[in-house]
Amino acid sequence: MEANKREIVDFGGLRSYFFPNLAHYITKNDEELFNNTSQANKLAAFVLGASKDAPGDEDILEMILPNDANAAVIAAGMDVCLLLGDKFRPKFDAAAEKLSGLGHAHDLVSVIDDDKKLGMLARKAKLKKTEDAKILQALLKVIAIDDAAEKFVELTELVSQLDLDFDVYVLTKILGLISEETSDEVDIIRDNVVNAFDSCKPLLKQLMLDGPKSEPADPFISLLMDPLEESVGKVVNHIAQLFEEASKNEGDESLVLRSQLGYQLFFLIVRSLADGKREVSKKILSGIPTSVRAEVFPGLQRSVYKSAVFLGNHIIQVLLGSKKSFEDWDVVGVAKDLESAWKRRAIAELIKKFQVSILEQCFDKPVPLIPQSPLNNDAVIDNVNKALQFALWLTEFYGSENETEALGELRFLDSTSKNLLVDSFKKFVQGINSKTHVTRIVESLEKCCLSDTPSGRKSNVQPSTSQQQDSAYTKEEMTTVHNTYSVNTKAQVLNGLSDTNSSGLLVDSKDSLSLQEISCDEVDSSTLLSSSRNIGEGVTVKAVDPVPEKVNDAQQQQTVNEIEMASDANQDTSSSASPEVAPSFSTDGWDSPTKSVALPPGMQQIDEEETTVADKDSTPQPQARAETAWGSGDATPMPLPAPTNQYKVSGFGEAKVAKGFGQFAPTSSAYGGGGGRGGYGGGDRGGRGGYGGDRGGRGGYGGGDRGGRGGYGGDRGRGGYGGRGGRGGF
């Protein structure tokens, strides 16, 4: 490993070895140190005289051994740890491991606990003339001395020999080596540092000579920073005087000012509750003149002030972690006031004012809620606000604490707050006379705690039923189909093939691993199309002709009626004048026009009917019904783009394959076996029979609207000359 070398770094005239990171920070942040000392690094502010507060150990370590330090900074920081004494020795050892990980070694790690080896190392350093040796020699002398004055003398050698005035000045302040005996010498070293700043950082020179830039202190704000018991009388009097002066005018400015002053009084009340000094709130009320009190506490609010204070203090202290006992609500009058609807409303209004006073800046400058508290002010305000919100919940849902709406309003409480409240109220209910109200509070909190657990959330889920999904389209599905109507045939088929959960247009993917099978129950014999074929635009399909199971007449009639209703709705949607339907939602929740147009999973394919179905009152226009990918009469209740002329089907009567929809096959005739859209008796979709017409076609002499499958006489014919339900021919 490479041994550490002690090298001096120059930052624009400011030389440093022990504190290179601090010197770099000071020279780069001179404006912040001068204009906003409170936001600057504590060690830097203390060294430059901008702050009188000495930095803590963590503040020092943050500067001498930063997390992202390189090997040179770590090695120098290890030397500083030795200078700062035994309490920093663990940091020295930890830094040694970190330095080793970087491929470097500190020369004092192996000898620091051996006085004999340290003495030998000091004698060798004394003989050398390098800066590295002089720094090491001074370092070893200082760590071997306990007396502060002697330490200071040895450190001054670094000033005279190496011009390390900045490092010596920093060590003097951190180690507390300034005394009456050393003050003159320290001033000289300080002047040397100031002169170094003269050429590179004049703001730092001004800071060290004149101190930090400061504004005149506001006497009222300073009074608010004093302990509450000592300052509350003066603060209330000051606010009351301003209030009375503003009351002489009735303009908007006066009303705004009086409102602000009123919230300042509420801020003081909340401060007394958060600080655990509830009796001070009584002193605040008594110190407010009658005229001011009538405006700040109108109507019933004066009557319920005590109840609002006791209730707020109780909840605030619980969420701030207090373990002390609380007065019975029956004894202090809280319970009685809560029983009255009008007094509950008055208490709620006061609690809302308490909340506003701490959430808004009532004073000209930010004022902490509890100035003497070591806790973070934002954390204190957050807990107090939650406590006041819970107190407000108690008033608004009095008597209905366990109802669903009330439980839902407790979402603002985190699990820790809920547990604190449950534990506190369980103890509280044991020592009071009337337990009904508090018991309801405990039960509601326990229900909320239970709902936060995985088992609780699971128990709230309603069991699903296995009811069959309605075959009719929903509004969202209709919207999705309309938005996908403009997509070309290839995109629609590919999207359908990619959806393994779709039903209606596509069969389940388990029936085919390499090729999706399209259910073609309205296309003629599957023996001619059992092999895969390219249907155009790079899409390959394989047709099958499943024989559907028969269903009972009642169920069949219901299914047909639902599909007809959905078909009417689809036609209305497709004929809308506006091309945009907003918003559309696909099955996976994305608002996109590229989603599959397959039917919902619960939708069933329509089986062949065995009963006669009554004609509808109004039949959709042929043009609208023909706008499907498979031709007219399609049972699939959705509009699809017009097909290309690549589709090939055959007639049931073993006619040759037609060249396209709307074209005659070479052998088709007036009694043909199912050509294209032409032919005297041919099916509109390459129908299945001859003279009798096709299953779904409109054409054919006397063909049924959903005509038969057979030849001249129909192999399964049921109907006569015409009729929508007829299966046979003439």
UniProtKB/Swiss-Prot annotation:
Activity regulation summary: Not inhibited by RNase inhibitor RNasin.
Main localization, broad class: cytoplasm
EC number(s) recorded for this UniProt protein: 4.6.1.24
Effect seen on changing H437A: Reduced catalytic activity
Keyword Nucleotide-binding belongs to the record: no
Involved in dimerization: region residues: 205-447
Swiss-Prot/TrEMBL catalytic activity: [RNA] containing guanosine + H2O = an [RNA fragment]-3'-guanosine-3'-phosphate + a 5'-hydroxy-ribonucleotide-3'-[RNA fragment]
The UniProt record lists the keyword Protein biosynthesis: no
Gene null: resulting phenotype: Temperature-sensitive and are only fertile at 20 degrees Celsius. 25% of progeny arresting as late embryos and 9% as larvae at 26 degrees Celsius. Surviving progeny are sterile at 26 degrees Celsius, most likely due to germline proliferation defects. The temperature-sensitive period extends from mid-larvae to young adults. Germline defects include increased apoptosis in the gonad, fewer germ nuclei, no sperm and no oocytes in the gonad arms. Double knockout with pgl-3 results in 37% of progeny arresting as late embryos and 9% as larvae at 26 degrees Celsius.
Details of cofactor binding: Does not require metal ions for catalytic activity.
Outcome reported for the amino acid change (mutating E401Q): No effect on catalytic activity
Bias (Polar residues) ranges: 452-472, 568-595
One CC-aspect GO term: P granule
Superkingdom as given in the UniProt entry: Eukaryota
Residue ranges of the TM segments: none
Single annotated GO MF: identical protein binding
Location of the active site: H437
Free-text comment about domains: The dimerization domain also acts as a hinge; changes in its structure probably impact oligomerization and RNA-binding. The RNA-binding RGG-box is required for the recruitment of some P-granule components such as pos-1 and probably mRNA, but is dispensable for granule formation.
Subunit structure: Homodimer. Interacts with pgl-2 and pgl-3; this association is not required for P-granule localization of either pgl-2 or pgl-3. Interacts with ife-1. Interacts with prmt-1; the interaction is direct. Interacts with nmad-1. Interacts with P granule components meg-1, meg-3 and meg-4.
Protein name, as recorded: Guanyl-specific ribonuclease pgl-1
Natural source organism: Caenorhabditis elegans
Underlying gene: pgl-1
